[in-house]
Design a protein with these regions (language model features):
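Juxtamembrane membrane-water interface segments immediately C-terminal to a transmembrane helix
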Residues: 31-64, 84-88
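Solvent-exposed, extracytoplasmic
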Residues: 87-99, 123, 178, 182-224
């Protein structure tokens, strides 16, 4: 009769040992799996953002080349120098550029003497003096005939009430380098959005672009462009260069876009 309690104790000890062993194995497996998943997440995010930065670099290079060609075109320079020149040639040139590049939505030339040529009638109704006081015009002159990128802004267009665009501006100069005016190309988000919104960043992952002033250039949620509250919500992501955000749930990775003041964050 005394042997049964001992046997029961041995069975219980063995059972508890098995449970403890399974618990230990499960814990080790969870930690290993969790670490593997985190490493995979980090690697996938870095690869996606690095590849995207190359796409954006090529995207910007093409747009900058278009702006440079326009700013240095002989017809544009001649019009900017000659007050009596007809704007039809310049307008035709700009419209041809818009029609052949799906990323472009409008083009503008503002001359130093206050004349304005635009491909969109709503923009044409604006006064050149107002444009000359805007930051994009002033920044273009500061950069001395080099392409300048603007943050996201709303533009009123004939085809639609308002559209979020970014712009590339460039100073127009004569052969001696003297200022003649500024050209501006307004760019829609279609190509950029189609690419960035399909990145492999997990179910809740997303990417956005800021400039060196932390102004938003692109974000899938357009509200951040005009909402200070939404902008503030993005600050924790902007603060992390390569690592996990507060709480350790979100992995964040940033890549500066070469030859620009843009930074891609995913």
């Amino acid at each position: 009769m005394k042997r049964y309690p001992l046997l029961i104790q041995l069975v219980l000890y063995f059972f508890l040992f098995i449970l403890l062993l399974f618990g230990l194995i499960g814990s080790l497996y969870y930690q290993t799996s969790s670490g593997t998943i985190r490493q995979l997440t980090e690697r996938t995010t870095r690869n996606s953002i690095d590849q995207s930065s190359q796409f954006i670099t090529s995207y910007l290079k093409k747009l900058k080349q278009t702006t440079t060609v326009l700013s240095k075109d002989q017809a544009v320079r001649q019009f900017a120098q000659d007050k009596s020149a007809d704007q039809e040639t310049v307008q035709h040139l700009m419209r041809t550029m818009i029609e052949t590049d799906p990323d472009l939505v409008s083009a503008v030339l503002v001359t130093k003497d206050g004349r304005l040529v635009a491909t969109d009638s709503k923009i044409s109704m604006q006064t050149s003096s107002d444009m000359m006081n805007e930051s994009w015009y002033q920044e273009a002159i500061k950069e001395r005939a080099m392409p300048v990128l603007t943050p996201a802004r709303k533009e009123s267009l004939t085809s639609e009430k308002e559209k979020w665009v970014v712009s590339i501006t460039q100073e127009v100069v004569d052969q001696t380098g003297q200022n003649l005016g500024v050209v501006r190309l307004d760019i829609g988000y279609d190509s950029l959005q189609a690419y960035l919104d399909h990145l492999q960043l997990g179910k809740q992952g997303f990417s956005f672009i800021i400039n060196q002033k932390h102004e938003f250039v692109y974000h899938p949620k357009k509200a951040v462009y005009s909402s200070s509250q939404e902008m503030q919500a993005m600050q924790p992501y902007i603060a992390v260069k390569d690592g996990y955000g507060k709480g350790g749930e979100n992995f964040i990775y940033q890549v500066p876009i070469p030859d620009s003041d843009w930074t891609l964050i995913g």
